[in-house]
Amino acid sequence: VRAIALVALLASLGAARAEEAFVTNQLSDDLTVVDLATSKPVATIAIGGKPAGVAVSNDGRFAYVTSPDAKAVTVVDAPARKVVGRVDVGGGPLGIAVAPDGAMVYVADWYAAAVRVIDAREQRVVASIAVGASPSGLAVTPDGLLLLSADRDDDSVSIIDTASRELRGIVKVGSRPFGVTIDADGKRAYTANVGTNDVSVIDVATAREIGRVHVGLRPYAVALAQGRGFVTDQYDGKVSVFDLATLQPVKRITVGDYPEGIEATADGKRILVANWESNTLSMIDAAELKVIGEVKVGDGPRAFGAFLRRTE
């Protein structure tokens, strides 16, 4: 029976066979690489400095990891599974995002109320952009023209023109926004508001909040798939699901303890969730809205950012 169940699980994960998860483990100071086809860890990469944020480039060549305690960003050659660079950024690097073309890497400096801009080829900081207090999550629009920064202690989101590196607008949202996610069209953004236990919906073009969705306790980040939003509720050990069109709740899914990072696979069929206190990565079927697998990773997984990599 177990063998049959395993075969069924692997078959259901077939659509994710060309992806891997790069999970930052803050307490074990490393990065776990999980093969989504086999649901098994395939590599552990030492990082140091209490790694938290992670962003994999669109071409899958590099994974960029923030280490708040080291005040640095580590550059990982994703296919080779090895560290190939380290960029000192100062302050408290947390959230991170890569431009769609891979040329620039954006890093939220929690302490300096700024976003550092790294030239990916030169591996050095080339600019700094002032934003609100305690910037956390970052996201870039699919066309690469705009960068959004969730500024936790200002209860706002900064919208930045990536060409001029100037502020385009500031959007007031719920209390203490942390993770921010932009949809595939680049039209709407979603912030997980830790203080008000809700998600703000932002119209990117007009730079205004157009909706609010109540979720569970201490929402951390948001993923989007199949017309639904998926939100990690840290204090509840659940993922809240809501309809993107109606903004109405759909379901709450129990995952591991203290879920944090969350992302959808490229085909939108699976949702991956990093569970901080369980030291696991949960796999959710985005259509059936149920957990279909769990993988042990390192100690204190956060996976804050775009942590999935397409391998083909």
Please report, for each region that a protein language model flagged, where it lies by residue.
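Bacterial N-terminal signal peptides
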Residues: 3-12
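Predominantly soluble domains enriched in secretory-pathway, periplasmic, or organellar proteins
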Residues: 12-312
